[in-house]
Amino acid sequence: FSAWQKKSYYKTSDTFCTLGLLVGNMVVVVATKGLTLAFHIYLYQFKIFDIASMVPLWMMWLMAFILIDLVFYIYHRMSHRVSFLWAIHMSHHSSEEMNFAVSFRQAWFGPISKIPFFMILPLIGLDPTIVAVAGSISTLWGIVGHTQIINKLGPLEIFLNTPSHHRVHHGANKQYIDKNYGNLLIIWDKMFGTFEPCLLYTSPSPRD
């Protein structure tokens, strides 16, 4: 689509680098996904709240999407602030481009680094299967955010982490550094003081 628009959003060398990271990441995902789900099912036995008996199924799903996003916000913010986690996450910010391919530029050990954060979800009583499915769906929205093709999305900008909001997160402009950590929702950034609207042209840049 970008080629049809005659936009230079992709570079061959950059995309091949992304593919290399993606292969390693997927190997780890395949190796750990089942184990992580089994671990969550085990933890679910010790749940603090029996949410399934307290709310209807649709509300359990809604809670899963919201709480997954909150935990991701915390994980993502710490990945920019804690040296060990940044060493894992920084590969995602190593591109000078902003395109769909960058969404797949994921660290090999990223899936493992998330485990200590997301284990809280089954412990508070969220069904592990629902958490797994809702998490996968949320990840798909995260892919959509890595593009320059989509401009602003009207009223959705108020509560969703839209592509324009996520371009800020990848921007090299000083006021954009370490902003907009949300994945599905932008409300956490607004609540916790890390929100920055997209007012200037964002220039993606690799970070040390």
Predicted regions and their residues:
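Long, highly hydrophobic alpha-helical transmembrane signal-anchor segments
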Residues: 31-56
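Residue-level signal for inorganic ion chemistry
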Residues: 19
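Membrane-interface helix-loop junction between the first two transmembrane segments
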Residues: 1-16
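Conserved small/polar residues in nucleotide/adenosyl-binding loops
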Residues: 201-208
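Membrane-embedded catalytic scaffold of the fatty acid hydroxylase/desaturase
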Residues: 23-32, 55-200
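Short, low-complexity, polar/charged sequence segments that are solvent-exposed and flexible
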Residues: 15, 41, 107-108, 187, ...
